[in-house]
């Protein structure tokens, strides 16, 4: 990542969108290292162990590589280390978080070796530098994008045995003050409201909310399945149109499509890029 950002600087790239959607996370210290590429110095995350001692991951030596505008795109499946990074960027006011509230996994796991293998267990919770927990709460975006993902059945909070966090003291840090995401809110909402794609999202959500009962009539089930397939096809083709690619003629063609190693634009990235352009103009 550091090498890539240096290349972007060399190419005079004016801003980036970091897509962390569906990113389930990774190592705590990798999230810490990634955060340091975007800030001067200071704390990145706090870890509270079973003895209630708090360790602050902190460095006074700057390893910052990227100083230009940053957008972080997240969704309900962004979890753990992804949330550490997104939360730090938000707390430092270093980047704008766009998407949906993240998963809410703020626990730290470790492995203990045994004679027959390893045991994975949870022994700590990590907290944002503000002292607020990510556990259960997740990271709430600055700009919310409508989604078909159901917040009520997704996330750490839906587990019966999920650990209940408490707040801790904040760590000393100095936030960036070079922009206010509220300045982008009105134009962002206007674009979302005018978008055929997101209007379709809202239409599908309303359909689902009004059809909470599942019919046992086979003909009705076939109609529901056909409607779901048509909705999916319409949303998929929207992304292909944005990418300048040929639309799928029918759902069967979409099902038979072999995913290639290529970038496909989608509506959320499209909106994020529009926000990035505005942010660049505000900071220029």
Locations of regions flagged by a protein language model:
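Cleft-lining beta-strand/loop regions that shape enzyme active-site pockets
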Residues: 1-115, 261, 265, 269, ...
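Short flexible/disordered coil segments
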Residues: 76-88, 111-114, 133-137, 158-170
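Conserved functional hotspot residues or short segments at active or partner-binding sites
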Residues: 134-284
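Residues in well-ordered beta-strands of folded domains
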Residues: 45-46, 122-124, 164
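Short, functionally important structural connectors and interaction interfaces within domains
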Residues: 19, 36, 118-119, 135, ...
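Polar, glycine-rich mid-to-C-terminal structural blocks
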Residues: 81, 93, 104-152
